[in-house]
Amino acid sequence: MGDKIFHNLSGKTLVATPHVITKGIYHKSLIYMLSHTEEGAIGLIFNRLVNHIDLKSFFKIKNDKITTPVMVPIYLGGPIEHEKGFFLHSSDYNKNLLLDFHNDLAVSSNLEISEDIAFGKGPKNSLFIVGYTAWKPGQLEEELEKNLWLVMDCNKEFIFADNPESKWHNALKHLGIDEIHFSSQIGNA
């Protein structure tokens, strides 16, 4: 038996398969993969809208120039560390980036971006996401072998689409899959 070939999925999108992941946080989830190495993987769910928050209050922005609340949608990125907030955003904003991708996306997690968004000087597109998803070494590969996830290239239109409820269905359509015809029986040929 030979060694398995590692396929790096950083910058890709995971699409939860229908009828396999049937409940919980991963049901019909789309996950943007921040990092995927042989040591594990980290991603952000980007279609779990949970509420709207005031950036000024959340980040405790002390700036007298911001007089009204700056309400933004808040997404649940995964079950780990909900006290951590991230901005998944377009790469037109490049101050103090946490991660910079070559597919026109970046991730920031600092006070400066929240202030810039509040002043209208932030990125053209952004999602505020709390928490993240992580896999131990080999765990994601095992889930992929069990067909729990489909993999698609990053598509900014899906990530920043206005209607989070339709993102998953639109991703399936993009992959040429009709949920109705997706088998609840899984396996590899």
Swiss-Prot record:
PANTHER family: UNCHARACTERIZED PROTEIN YQGE, UPF0301 PROTEIN YQGE
Protein name stated in the entry: UPF0301 protein RMA_0049
Pfam families: DUF179 (PF02622)
GO CC entries: cytosol
Family from the record: Belongs to the UPF0301 (AlgH) family.
SUPFAM superfamilies noted in UniProt: VC0467-like
